[in-house]
């Protein structure tokens, strides 16, 4: 008989007081200890264990949204089965219903990785060991890769269980072979495998049934919650699925294009550019203050640039502000001679009030001045 090798028994670390005391953050090697607890709980199985026992087992070690995946290869090709939290209890129960009396997992050189909210355990040399008592005492060793994801909290429950089976072996004690060495029929029966790829017919049939049961979990849950008929549950689920399919995908928020500020030409600059010729032609008739009127109509002030890190576009340009002087307009009162002459500051005898003599009067005065000479 082969010796059973379950590996070294995990020791309680100093920080662990006793089972049942909650802790907010798990200690080191907590994943190994959870596998040890799972094996210990499976060893407590008896034939009297009912559905409530298996549901309590699953609640203790699996999350509410846990997914269990089994992959293996049969004669007709590779198989992959994925079941949810509701069907996980029946999966472990089917192993014992298939004739197994004991179940445990042996992990060699597992690799533990910490992530944001979960801890992953990857073991490339995992062995699932089951012992069968019928029709003959047989130990089945299923070798494969086991990948687990534990939630990083005080409960450390499994969220993802993925077991990829590579090969299996069925071991029989030598004593049994010696007892039936003279019986050819018994030796022929002992030479046949009792499992397929390490799984019993009960487990394989249940996994095939899960292909139908897993999609129906939504219907069953809706039936229990709303007490609808199966036909109404199916119509509601199909309608919601159709809505999810035809609903347009949410467009990502588009960033508004940056609008560049257009610099508008001010009235003073327009006058200075468009009326430049007029200013040159009438420079003899107007006072020099008229040029000051064009340049002092408005004041262009350049603001400070924004700080580093601002958005490109509006904010990174210098802000140009137009300040209008409404109290003083140099153009008023320069070209209008009537308003200038009617000023109250000018008296009746003011020299500024006298008009220059006309050309005819100057001609009439010239002959008299020559005659007097």
Curated annotation (Swiss-Prot):
Cellular compartments annotated: Nucleus
A GO term, aspect molecular function: LIM domain binding
Q: Which residues form the LIM interaction domain (LID) domain?
A: 298-337
The entry's keywords: Developmental protein, Nucleus
Quote the biased-composition stretches of kind Low complexity, using this chain's numbering. Answer: 266-282
Provide a GO CC annotation, any one.
nucleus
Sequence intervals crossing the membrane:
none
What Pfam families does the record tag this protein with?
LID, LIM_bind
Spell out the InterPro entries in the cross-references. LID, LIM-bd/SEUSS
Q: Where is the composition biased (Polar residues)?
A: 288-297
UniProt xrefs under Gene3D superfamilies: Cysteine Rich Protein (2.10.110.10)
Spell out the residue ranges making up region: Disordered: 248-297, 329-373
Q: Tell me a GO biological process for this protein.
A: positive regulation of transcription by RNA polymerase II
Q: How is it modified after translation?
A: Undergoes rnf12-mediated ubiquitin-proteasome-dependent degradation.
Main localization (coarse) = nucleus
Signal peptide span:
none
Role played = Binds to the LIM domain of a wide variety of LIM domain-containing transcription factors. Acts as a coactivator together with otx2 to stimulate lhx1/lim1-mediated activation of the gsc promoter in the Spemann organizer. Acts synergistically with lhx1/lim1 and ssbp in axis formation.
What UniProt notes about the protein's domains is: The dimerization domain is located in the N-terminus.
Family according to the record: Belongs to the LDB family.
Self-association state and partner proteins as the record states: Forms homodimers and heterodimers. Interacts with and activates lhx1/lim1. The stoichiometry of lhx1/lim1 and ldb1 is important for their function and an excess of ldb1 can inhibit lhx1/lim1 function. When bound to lhx1/lim1, escapes degradation by rnf12. Interacts with the N-terminal region of rnf12.
Task: List the protein's name.
Answer: LIM domain-binding protein 1
Q: Which organism is it from?
A: Xenopus tropicalis
């Amino acid at each position: 008989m082969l010796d059973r090798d379950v590996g070294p028994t995990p020791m309680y670390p100093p920080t662990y007081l006793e089972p049942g005391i909650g802790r907010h953050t798990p200690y080191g090697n907590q994943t190994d200890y959870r596998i040890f607890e799972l094996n210990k709980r499976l060893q407590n199985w008896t034939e009297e264990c009912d559905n409530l026992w298996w549901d309590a087992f699953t609640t203790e070690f699996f999350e509410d949204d846990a997914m269990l995946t089994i992959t293996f290869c049969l004669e007709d090709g590779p198989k992959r089965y994925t079941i949810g939290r509701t069907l996980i209890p029946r999966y472990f129960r089917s192993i014992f219903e298939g004739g197994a009396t004991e179940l445990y997992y042996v992990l060699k050189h597992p690799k533990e990785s910490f992530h944001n909210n979960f801890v992953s355990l990857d073991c490339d040399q995992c062995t699932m060991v089951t012992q069968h008592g019928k029709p003959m005492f047989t130990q089945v060793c299923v070798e494969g890769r086991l990948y687990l994801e534990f939630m990083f909290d005080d409960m450390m429950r499994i969220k993802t269980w993925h077991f990829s089976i590579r090969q299996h072996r069925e071991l029989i004690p030598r004593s049994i072979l010696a007892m039936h060495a003279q019986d050819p029929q018994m030796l022929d029966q002992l030479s046949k495998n009792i499992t397929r790829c390490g799984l019993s017919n009960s487990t394989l049939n249940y996994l095939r049934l899960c292909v139908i049961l897993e999609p129906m979990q939504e219907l069953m849950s809706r039936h229990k919650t709303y007490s609808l008929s199966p036909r109404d549950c199916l119509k509601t689920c199909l309608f919601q699925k159709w809505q999810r399919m035809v609903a347009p995908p949410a467009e990502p928020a588009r960033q508004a294009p940056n609008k560049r500020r257009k610099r508008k030409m001010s009235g003073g600059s327009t006058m200075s550019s468009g009326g430049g010729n007029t200013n040159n032609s009438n420079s003899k008739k107007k006072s020099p203050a008229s040029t000051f009127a064009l340049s002092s109509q408005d004041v262009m002030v350049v603001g400070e640039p924004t700080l580093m890190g601002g958005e490109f576009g509006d904010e990174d340009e210098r802000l140009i502000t137009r300040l209008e002087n409404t109290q003083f307009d140099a153009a008023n009162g320069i070209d209008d001679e009537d308003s200038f002459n009617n000023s109250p500051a000018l008296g009746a005898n003011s020299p500024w009030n006298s008009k220059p003599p006309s050309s005819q009067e100057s001609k009439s005065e010239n002959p008299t001045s020559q005659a007097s000479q």
